[in-house]
Structure formats: C-alpha cells, structure tokens
C-alpha cells in the first residue's frame, strides 16, 4: 500500500487539538477526565500511524508523550468525552452500552484522511465512564498489544481499519480471568461512530437526536450526500457498500473478527474493536476464533451473512429518516452483489487471474472445498501458489505438502492450470502479481502470544520486531522467515475471548 503523504511535522505540545464530536448535543456523550495510571511506561508505538497526524516520532520517549497517551496529562484543546451507544450483541438486543473504557481526547489534522482531514485520538483503557456497567474501565496489556499489532497489520494489508498510535502500560493490577496489568491503547480513526450509535436513538424513540447524529455524520464524513435527493438513503447505501467490501477483504485474507456485534460496526466501514480476532491457519470454514461464541454466530463462513444482518439493523434505525420502506430496502440490496463482486475481484487477484471467466466462481468454490478437506494452512497456501509453473509438476510439491488429500489438490491444480492458460501472462509476472496481494506474514495468534509474554516481563523488543515484520506483509524478508512458519503444536491450545 502507498506510504502516507507526509505533512508538516509537529511536536506533541504544538499539536492543534479540537473535538468535533463535542459539537453534538450533550445527550450523545459524557464529558469526563481519564483516570490516571501510576508510573506509566511506553510499550510500543507506530511510526506510520504517527506520520498520519504529522507527529514527531522522536517525541515518543518523552514524559509528555507517555503521560498524554496514558490519560495522565490532558493536552491543550482537548475536551475528553465518552460516547453513548447501544447495540445487538450476538443477535440479541443489549440496550445501552457506550464507551465503557474509551475516552476520546479529540481530533487532530491528518491531511490524507478524506474528507474530514482529521483523525480522532481515543484512549482505550483510560478509566471508568458512565457506560462502564460492571467493568472497571481498564484494558490489560495482553489485549492492548493484540489490538495495536492487528490494527497496524491490517493497515499494511490494505484493509480498512482503525489505526493504533501506541500502547502505554502500568504495573497496576487488573483482575480478569487472572491477575494482569493495566495498559492504554491509543486508537485513531476519522470517527468511532458505530451502527449502535444510531440504534441507541432509534430504540429510545428519540428521532430528533437520530437526525442530529445522521446530519453530523453526513456533514463530517459524507459531505457529498448533503445535496442528494435523499441524503439518508445515500448514507445507508454507502455504509452498506463499504461494509460489504470490508468483509470481502476479511474473507480474502482469512481474518476473523470474533465479535461482530452492531456496536462494533463502524459507520465508515472500518475494522473496529479488535478483541478475540484471529487469522485463519488450518482452513476450516466454520472456525470460531472467539471461544465464548458457543453457537458459532461469528464463524469465518458466517461473517458475510452477519455483515448483511448488521446493515439491516442499521437500515431499521434510518427508516424514520429515509421515510420509505422500499427505499430503505433498495439501499440494503446492494450488499450481496457488492460483496460478491469485491470477493471475486480479490480472489482473482489472489489466483493471479487478470480476466473474468464464467466459471471462476466454480474454481473458487472447488478450491475452498479442497482447503477444507485437508485443513491446509490458508496463508501459506496462497503465498506458495505463486510459485506454481504451468506444466511443471515439480513446482507443485511445496503446495502438495500442505494437503492430506493430495489427489484432491492435484485435481484442483489441473483445473487451475487450464484456467491460467486463458490468461496472457507468464509465470514470473504472475508470481510478482500474486505475491503483491497474498501476504507472507500475518498476525498469527502464537506470534502475538510470544510477544505478549515477553512484554509481561518488561521486554518489549518482540512487540517492536513483530510490528516491523507485519508492516511489510508482502515482502519476502528472508531474515524473518520464522515469522511465516506454521504454528507450533502448543499453539493449538491457545484460546482468545472477549476478556480484555
């Protein structure tokens, strides 16, 4: 992906901070101060994220930086607040939720962010808010590192996502399933407004506030719709399109979110709230990455369907503004074709296909059946597929090693080679194109776990190293080959949940 366009570098103390979300009526948020953490220290930081806001990266070791992004120091211009929202969790209406441990510091200039030209800075784990419910308002080091690494890894993969500026830690004890230490992750996005933000006002029958929120979102992030015949239908159509395309990207790279509740769905079509996520390893379409998801609602195979369900939930809330059921349904009908078109486009690229053929869908389906039958490693398969040479059986061997049922793979490979013969590209050109879209490196859970365990002993070097590797997922990086390896046996026992 393209590097961010640089703009004037500024020091933290000179950063012009505002808060456009605070322009909404007070019912939409609660103004409050973060709860300080004792003796904070820097765990990790992203230079590429800092570049988006023109922040001088040499500031990261300063006391002011660490204190600011722990919530112990409030910069000039900040109007800290936590937003209210509601949502459906695992398909069930959960009522009011809100930022239970996230506090928005404000927004800063970010010229590459179209159309707002700004990024919000949000501290996750900054203390109790009125929306904390039974929680303590804190995040733990483990989950904060996971969110930081995955945010930056997804950005490097070219997938729409919130960004992570840094993680700070403290020795303060936090009780979860076991004793852990507290941390704060600083997240960045043009907006953290969610589907659940709209659900909150719809289900509380406060349509004036619903309209106020919709008008704010359109003015700030979709200004092209202000003059549309029906701005709210245009908004729903665009959000539905972005959501479908985002999830197509997830499926193509084997990413599983784990908690696709409506309160975790971004109104900008960004991957939001990294919790019990995972990247597909041994392929299993029904894989559940969140061990608390007993029914498999958010399994890999169901993500496209759930994305559509969530868009319909959003459509329900916008119906009073759109004013017509048929118009609302017309906006939502874009989901299925938009998803199918984007997924097919991504799959053709992954297979090195430059043209569209009528039977491509059958080729894709046959491939996933073969991957399922042998539980072949998702990332390794697509990366190695670029090495295949038409008519050279020996070039298949590294691929065949990934399959238990090699005969089934051979049958598919024959279909694939016949399909490649319809293309006007040679083996070397195809390999280059495929390696540019099929990552060699993804954030496997075991890699994150190794980095986390070292960080829990105050060794943050592996977090920094893993970030360095994941920022260039398509490069060969021969010196980092071990980060592309199959997971060790002990990784089979790793479980991730909503606990964070």
UniProtKB/Swiss-Prot annotation:
It catalyses: L-seryl-[protein] + ATP = 3-O-(5'-adenylyl)-L-seryl-[protein] + diphosphate; L-threonyl-[protein] + ATP = 3-O-(5'-adenylyl)-L-threonyl-[protein] + diphosphate; L-tyrosyl-[protein] + ATP = O-(5'-adenylyl)-L-tyrosyl-[protein] + diphosphate; L-histidyl-[protein] + UTP = N(tele)-(5'-uridylyl)-L-histidyl-[protein] + diphosphate. Its EC number is 2.7.7.-, 2.7.7.108. InterPro entries: SelO. The keyword Manganese applies. ATP binds at residues 98, 100-101, 124, 136-137, 187, 194, 273. The keyword Nucleotidyltransferase applies. Mg(2+) binds at residues 264, 273. It is an enzyme of class 2 (transferase). PANTHER family: PROTEIN ADENYLYLTRANSFERASE SELO, MITOCHONDRIAL (PTHR32057:SF14). Nucleotidyltransferase involved in the post-translational modification of proteins. It can catalyze the addition of adenosine monophosphate (AMP) or uridine monophosphate (UMP) to a protein, resulting in modifications known as AMPylation and UMPylation. This is Protein nucleotidyltransferase YdiU. It comes from Herminiimonas arsenicoxydans. The lineage of its organism: Bacteria, Pseudomonadati, Pseudomonadota, Betaproteobacteria, Burkholderiales. The gene is ydiU.
